[in-house]
């Protein structure tokens, strides 16, 4: 009989009952499929009392004669050691088959879970990188976790009365703009300090450092403001000290950019990001290899990939309960890049509409091409 033959059988091993080619270990004996089926049916249907030998129980059983005498064939099954207690009735056989199928399905699910569900956490090397980035952020993040206690609300009358009409419907309140410029220099300085605390950034050529900082500065400042969105007062806290409304930020010079930052803040409030996640977002923004004019593009790209991998593994470690947390968080990088691009365009309008003496030198140095 052809078909699957278990590996534990020797080549051409024979059935101990009839001498036909064996197919496996059945009911404690190595037998062919025919004798296995005969033995099972006999026990399940209790047929052996009905068997009768015409030749006084002395028949020789082989693969030719096995179907001629059921009594002698059954006796030989018992003689060679086939176990009647291993034969299951229909209900037990169905239960066993169901159990086998359930176990098989369980193993399939477990293997699938291992394949697609395994979420690696940071390696020792990645933990060291995460530690460096987090410490850099904490050391340069104004007011730290005490920002709510330290913040001061911009007076309501500031930023509500636009006196200069900017192009494209934007409005600039010069008093609000003046207030914002007072905190912009320390805010920019903190972004620079953050970058300079990262060894991989400091190892880059000075020209690349400048390009990266000019490219990411608004993005990182926007992120730091967005994670300090307060839904109760509907304000963002700038540089850890000045709480402003959407209208004040808009009329103070940012125009539609303020809407994007506020919307980002509202969205991020459900993410419950910790300092490490904010720090890694900043590192990813900093090491953007697509900034025009860079020399060490591949080196910067490799560095960003290292941050992204450590970041993803840290997200796995944190076990957020938001569905698709990691891809959703990565989309915020795109949002921040868009904010940076919109601000670059908005900056040109501000330069036209606001007196030059109101712009701090560092502000001009970072945002002018």
UniProtKB/Swiss-Prot annotation:
3,3',5-triiodo-L-thyronine binds at residues 190, 239. Zn(2+) 1 binds at residues 15, 18, 32, 35. It comes from the Eukaryota. Residues 1-14 are annotated as: Modulating. 3,3',5-triiodo-L-thyronine 1 binds at residue 343. GO terms for cellular component: nucleus; RNA polymerase II transcription regulator complex. Pfam families: Hormone_recep, zf-C4. Keywords: DNA-binding, Metal-binding, Nucleus, Receptor, Transcription, Transcription regulation, Zinc, Zinc-finger. Zn(2+) 2 binds at residues 53, 59, 69, 72. GO terms for molecular function: nuclear receptor activity; RNA polymerase II cis-regulatory region sequence-specific DNA binding; sequence-specific double-stranded DNA binding; thyroid hormone binding; zinc ion binding. Composed of three domains: a modulating N-terminal domain, a DNA-binding domain and a C-terminal ligand-binding domain. Nuclear hormone receptor that can act as a repressor or activator of transcription. High affinity receptor for thyroid hormones, including triiodothyronine and thyroxine. Belongs to the nuclear hormone receptor family. NR1 subfamily. This is Thyroid hormone receptor beta. It comes from Gallus gallus (Chicken).
């Amino acid at each position: 009989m052809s078909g699957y033959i278990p590996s534990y059988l020797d080549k051409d091993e024979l059935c101990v009952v009839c001498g036909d080619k064996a197919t496996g270990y059945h009911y404690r004996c190595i037998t062919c499929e025919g004798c296995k089926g005969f033995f099972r049916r006999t026990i399940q249907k209790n047929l052996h009392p009905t068997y009768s030998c015409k030749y006084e129980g002395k028949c020789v059983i082989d693969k030719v004669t096995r179907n001629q005498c059921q009594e002698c064939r059954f006796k030989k099954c018992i003689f060679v050691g086939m176990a009647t207690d291993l034969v299951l009735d229909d209900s037990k056989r169905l239960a066993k088959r169901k159990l086998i199928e359930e176990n098989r399905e369980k193993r399939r699910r477990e293997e699938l879970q291992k394949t697609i569900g395994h979420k690696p956490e940071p390696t020792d090397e990645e933990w060291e990188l995460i530690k460096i980035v987090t410490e850099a952020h904490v050391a340069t993040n104004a007011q730290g976790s005490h920002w709510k206690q330290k913040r001061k609300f911009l007076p309501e009358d500031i930023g509500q009365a636009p006196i200069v009409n900017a192009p494209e419907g934007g409005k600039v309140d010069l008093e609000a703009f003046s207030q914002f410029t007072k905190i912009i220099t320390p805010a920019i300085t903190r972004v620079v300090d953050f970058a300079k605390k990262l060894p991989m950034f400091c190892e880059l050529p000075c020209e690349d450092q400048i390009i990266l900082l000019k490219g990411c500065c608004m993005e990182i400042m926007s992120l730091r403001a967005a994670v300090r969105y307060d839904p109760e007062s509907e304000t963002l806290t700038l540089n850890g000290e000045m709480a402003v409304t959407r209208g004040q930020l808009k009329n103070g010079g940012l125009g539609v950019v303020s809407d994007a930052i506020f919307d980002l803040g509202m969205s991020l409030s459900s993410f419950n990001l910790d300092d490490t996640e904010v720090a890694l977002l900043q590192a990813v923004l900093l090491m953007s290899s697509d900034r025009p004019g860079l020399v060490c593009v591949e080196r910067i790209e490799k560095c960003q990939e290292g941050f992204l991998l450590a970041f993803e593994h840290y997200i796995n470690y944190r076990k957020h309960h938001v569905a698709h947390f990691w891809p959703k968080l990565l989309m915020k990088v795109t949002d921040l890049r868009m904010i940076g691009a919109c601000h670059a365009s908005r900056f040109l309008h501000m330069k036209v509409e606001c007196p030059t003496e109101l712009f701090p030198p560092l502000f001009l140095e970072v945002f002018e091409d």
